Amino acid sequence: VNNEKTTLYHIDFSFDELKLGGSAFAQSLGKVGDDVPCVQDAEYFRDAFLAVQELVNKGLILAGHDISAGGLITTLLEMCFANVEGGMEISLDKMKEQDIIKILFAENPGIVIQISDKHKEEVKKILEDAGVGFVKLGKPTDERHILVSKGDATYQFGVDYMRDVWYSSSYLLDRKQSMNGCAKARFENYKMQPVEFAFMPEFKGKLSQYGITPDRRTPSGIRAAIIREKGTNGEREMAYSLYLAGFDVKDVTMTDLISGRETLEDVNMIVYCGGFSNSDVLGSAKGWAGGFLFNEKAKEALDKFYAREDTLSLGICNGCQLMMELGLINPEHKKKGKMLHNDSHKFESTFVGLTIPTNRSVMFGSLSGSKLGIWVAHGEGKFYLPYDEDKYNVVAKYSYDEYPGNPNGSDYSIAGLASADGRHLAMMPHLERAIFPWQNGCYPADRKNSDQVTPWIEAFVNARKWIEEKVR
């Protein structure tokens, strides 16, 4: 966390002298060594672990990293790699060891933690009471470097330069796997595309703001059905998101629809979840779409549902591919949009930034102007759209046009579309996997401990409220 009113501490778990045997540093010199670090006192190790757990449970640690391959300097660098700004100024004068090579590269078990200065006395007391040794290392700085000093010697490590060195092995492997120059694009862009957040002023992050609670045990009367096919795997997260937002959730399989056991007449919202229907052997969602198109009862149930004026639908990932395949988003278009393989021709699983443009949709309309983080996990997520962008009701765009911020190469960087009337929505990213701050790959530091939910829950609440108005 780039905050000057914080301090970094080293906590040793080994109770041993610093040793280089078996370290990455030794291996880089073509050696192994025979003097390796060890945990000398198992009880001390336990005490150190439990003391750190107490700090974690009390919310006293802002950031932390273990010391493992590469030693202390690698730990410090990797803590900086998580941000695009700032660095550290580190003094090793309080370390008993005088050999700076051992201090920086020994892999003795330990951790580095970052503590707010207002909590440092409480942290020190917890560690001292547990008999755990710790050393103050230094503080964050606005400069993009790590400045390490020991006595009269000072060493400077450029964070961005070292980050590229650190990432270069991944790039070389990626180059063997990715197509269309995506490996090079990732290497050039990964540090230029931070996930940015911008919440609407009225968002408070509390369940009470939406009048919802996870403790609800009585039916709301607003029913949604999750439709799944063999290979669907995202239904549980989706069911909980809908339930938390106030829906009564029903499980409907394709077999139910094909046999006529379910007709969708008793629900006002249907959701097609993510996964790999029919193992994608015919292409993503092709077999699933065939289940609707070539089975009379399933097709009749779907057609009647979309003919009603009091219905909503949502397709996520594999469900988005299904909706596009069935032409449910833009049935008025002569040329149908398609979902194609990612430009990289790899399965992309990553946490990306989304921007919600001003849009006409039931679920995302109130989120217009927001910037949020979200997970993607797909192999065929590229929107191929035959018309100009203004012909579509765009509800979500990747925050960056270039790969990997746009993980699939979608036209116009589109991540989600809605029907012209805003009732039916298809998107590749998984909003149901980001409704809580702890689910997010990153989240605003000043909110992650206070927010109960993220703005994504609002989309589900909007859907429930819209239906309540329609069926009143």
Predicted region positions:
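Cysteine-centered functional microenvironments
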Residues: 97-109, 310, 341-342, 346
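N-terminal beta1-alpha1 cap of cysteine-dependent amidohydrolase-like domains
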Residues: 150-316, 320-332, 340-348, 411, ...
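Intein/HINT protein-splicing elements and their conserved insertion hotspots or analogous self-processing inserts
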Residues: 1-105, 117-223, 231
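Short helix/loop capping segments that flank catalytic or ligand/cofactor-binding pockets
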Residues: 11, 17-22, 73-76, 122-124, ...
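Conserved acidic residues
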Residues: 6, 268, 425
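Amide-donor transfer/coupling interface in amidating biosynthetic enzymes
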Residues: 137, 260-262, 303-304, 337-472
